[in-house]
């Protein structure tokens, strides 16, 4: 399925039905009064948020969406039938703009949210409406009013609590695939991910949290370079960002700084969101390299850095714990810990991962290893630089 997050459509509400001219004609009533009924109301076009949809692809094939017209009135004071409303399903997170004015008409976030985008025309009046003491046999009637017609721009912003951002090939798709049931395309080359991927990560409380894997950003993404500009909007609704950095890159700190600059340049509060900085692919590094790169990245970020290996499934539980804390959904620490659902890759059970420990001075005072086996904490001066 192709992911389409923008579309332009034209909506046309139904016209109101015309009123009619009719007179009562019955046996022994040669001069019956007016009996022309009113026309029916035209159908309206209404957008409805549907959690089962994740793309605006369908709107590429139906550029004009119409509702039914109202029926004309009938004799004997019968009103015409109203036209049926046209309910149009859109993904949750769809923002609707008037193309001509640029006005935001509505933001359909919750399942079942509705937005009236084109109102049906009122029905016309039959001649019975014009009966008066001065006009006992009126022949006036009115036609139904036309329904509203407008062009709309639909813009989809995915609804996820956690967004995963980073340079191409940082391991974002691998991470979301091991912590959720999402199955994005994964390959060892940049820009494997060409569209956002959503995954629901189980929470210890029993519910789930939606994560979004955003296609890789590169320098100049806020100006439309690469794929980033098209998809940065999808992290606007997130509450927390996981900033994934490739630990095997030539300069992880430089990669981190590039993404931070792009988030600031794009605006919309992205750089102000809480971030969890994560050094990935440490299974491909020596312990000393992990320690050095984690320390440097922590200094650049001014915050602790989680060191993980998504492919080896190491360090993921502590990372998720930090996510729950940022979301204010930290599980009850007093209840017995449930068995981890994230299992290490065979052969990697004893992989030792260096994770920085923050000191009271907000500088890194040491590291602790996560993974199989015991490893003592050690000070930075015990690590070769």
Curated annotation (Swiss-Prot):
Domain of life: Bacteria
Cofactor: Mg(2+)
Domain Obg: 1-159
All residue ranges annotated as the OBG-type G domain in the record: 160-328
EC number assigned by the record: 3.6.5.-
InterPro entries: G_OBG, GTP-bd, GTP-bd_Obg/CgtA, GTP1-OBG_CS, GTP1_OBG_dom, GTP1_OBG_dom_sf, OBG_GTPase, P-loop_NTPase
Subcellular location: Cytoplasm
Residues given in the record as Mg(2+) binding sites: 173, 193
HAMAP family referenced in this protein's UniProt entry, alphabetically: GTPase_Obg
This protein's name: GTPase Obg
